[in-house]
Amino acid sequence: NSVLLGVGGPKLGAVNWDYLASQHIVCIGAQESGKSTLISTIIAGLTQIGRERARLVVIDHRRSHLGAIDPDMLAGYSASTQETEKLVAVMKITLEERLPSAEVTPQQLKDRSWWTGPDIFLIVDNLDLVADMAFAPLLSVLPHARDVGLHVVITRKSGGCVRALFQPFLAEIKDQSPFIIVLDADKDDG
């Protein structure tokens, strides 16, 4: 249930993302600081998990990962606003079908056994290139991300980050205590 991200910390040990303990990742950094490399690393790690346990929806408006993702793992890929809006609409339908009904028992909630299928990893490289409203349909299911098997991985430039943290989509992710990675950034960016 974890993906190796790299080496770090005071002892230069392995840094892993346990996606069951910390549902989402937010990575902030300056241009050319390694944000897209992090995305590539996460995609490679999730590919090792297999399509039975993980499916990827990749929003990549710079097309940095085009052709680099195993098609078997890919549930959707978008490089434009229109494609992103369509993918998000389909995701919302899938995730709403996974929401627990009133008949779900506490044990089923704990085991997440009222639905079957892989977890969905929404991977957004360069969130600053995507209009926040493109993700508005997901706002109703984001609070239930753990229950419905949704994980969000976001990279964003550091410039304007403080303001962006108050936009609805990123604010909801922030409220769920994501795994935070801060790469090289100008201190004036906040």
Where are these regions (language model features)?
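Conserved AAA+ ATPase "SRH/arginine-finger" region at the nucleotide-binding site
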Residues: 179-188
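A cross-family glycoside hydrolase active-site/sugar-binding cleft signature
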Residues: 155, 188-189
